[in-house]
Amino acid sequence: GNPQVMVSRACTGFVKRLFEMEVPEIRSGLVVIKKIVREAGYRTKMAVTSVDPSLDCVGSCVGPRGMRINNIVHELDGEKIDVIEWCSDISEFIARALSPAKAMMVQINEEEKKATAIVPDDKLSLAIGKAGQNVRLAAKLTDWKIDVKPYSEVSGIVGDVFEG
């Protein structure tokens, strides 16, 4: 039994190293990677935060004219990468995690650790993603179950809540 070393381009550690190499603010510790989730070859979602509130942590990762992130996307053969600013407010973090879709509202059920994200009808498929990939990765990133609903399906109910 010779020991074997497995090296994989599919693990999240690979993406982390690419960002460490490409982004000086990550190397220096000014920008911190909170969590990375991915479906290798398709999409990565990465939550970042900054130790300095005046520093744009997402902008640092993207780089001038998208240069830094484009180098990483190129290295990953065109895999999509969503860099999301981490947030301690869970409904805000879930809304951000559904990027590139924009949630209008996120309802939280603490007991079940379940969230319902309301999105504009024309953004429903973007929020869910191809074969559910976007919402699945958002759920892994936030550690919450996420249900995505179109605004038209809940507009009556949501309206009642706001008015009542």
Task: Name each model-derived stretch.
Residues G1-G164:
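RNA-contacting regions in translation and RNA-metabolism proteins
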